[in-house]
């Protein structure tokens, strides 16, 4: 996920090209979301929580508004993160907290929308059961369970988010192992740091750091070279970032010439014509596209050798080999978000509203039911439009080489997808609340009471009048939205 998802998505601004147009578009979306979503959600939260009678519907939307309001409050940090080109000046705790809040909002919103959908379906198909069992207490209990599950789903974000320092700038990103994910710039620095030599370079017959030529057998490929590099995820550098003389700057040059380790001796009886005394000291031998450790003896069966395919790819292409292996926690996080946070709720919503439409076409329902259905369908549609690009790009990023055109496109527009997902928190109050006739009436009345209290010379009288008006109309409030 771009900055916080990532969501979502494992890439951060640190590893993404700074494409000005998508970033500006993302900042515009986030700014509008904050400017519209903060007062909109605040108004809904105040009116639904304090001015309207507590019903099952108001409980659903009250909790949904709370989740959206938390997301809106975190948007200024996202804007600053984009404006600073990925730098994170807020410290380690906020690096963990703010992305967690965004993910918490994501799961809480989708779970609440799913609960609202199931609730509407039960009202249509089981009206008698709902009359006996559908109450505010049950709705509050379900909302509490939803918050607990959403909190559990955001724990991996809080655990794996860490601060990285690159070029004296702090970055907020995922860290899935104790040693951290090294960037190719760090790889140039010291590839053997905190690594034991025997785990990097070994020869057959080498026991306890001693080379025993007598252990070689003539028919056992005596000079087979094996390597065992620790699993580490590196990013392929661009062509411009590599030195022109990549051979002289090869990060493997020190691996094959470790200080203090004697070069292996050629067993007696082996042909040595044209052979260098210390083949491991000859960097050209390892930079050859054919990887001939012993050029003069390449055709001799006694000098057969084997090197890992990644070394062959590296030296034949003259660049690092891109490791397509993705971290297991990242795959688990992305797939869980896709299935639990998008696919399963989407299937439930589409199925329930399809059944409701069919049922309403067969029976006679009040106009209020039709209005509720239209508002709910719009809310679900907007949710799918906002969140589908985020989840799709997250899954594609797991299986796409970032050097391909598709990979570059995903990285460039990842910020836009994340901003669009956050915009869902702005649309909800205008869709499900402000479109409702009863809510518009109560909102106008509440705003009017605020203005009267602010400008009236008789504050007590104005407040008393508005309070009486609120009390007199409570009995006429409908439970539909």
From Swiss-Prot:
Pfam families, alphabetized: 7tm_1
Glycosylation, residue list: 9, 168, 194
Membrane topology: Multi-pass membrane protein
Cytoplasmic side: 47-57, 119-139, 358-374, 436-481
Gene3D superfamilies: Rhodopsin 7-helix transmembrane proteins (1.20.1070.10)
Source superkingdom: Eukaryota
Disulfide bonds: 95-172
Extracellular side: 1-23, 81-96, 161-337, 398-414
Presence of keyword Transcription regulation: no
Biological process terms in GO annotation: chemotaxis; inflammatory response; phospholipase C-activating G protein-coupled receptor signaling pathway; positive regulation of cytosolic calcium ion concentration
GO cellular component, as recorded: plasma membrane
Phosphothreonine modification, residue list: 460
Cellular localisation: Cell membrane
Residues modified to Sulfotyrosine: 174, 184, 315
Record keywords, A-Z: Cell membrane, Chemotaxis, Disulfide bond, G-protein coupled receptor, Glycoprotein, Membrane, Phosphoprotein, Receptor, Sulfation, Transducer, Transmembrane, Transmembrane helix
Molecular-function annotations in GO: complement component C3a receptor activity; complement component C5a receptor activity; G protein-coupled receptor activity
SUPFAM superfamilies assigned to the protein according to its UniProt record, in alphabetical order: Family A G protein-coupled receptor-like
Residue positions where Phosphoserine is found in the record: 456
Stated role: Receptor for the chemotactic and inflammatory peptide anaphylatoxin C3a. This receptor stimulates chemotaxis, granule enzyme release and superoxide anion production.
Subunit structure: Interacts with VGF-derived peptide TLQP-21.
Similarity field: Belongs to the G-protein coupled receptor 1 family.
Protein name, as recorded: C3a anaphylatoxin chemotactic receptor
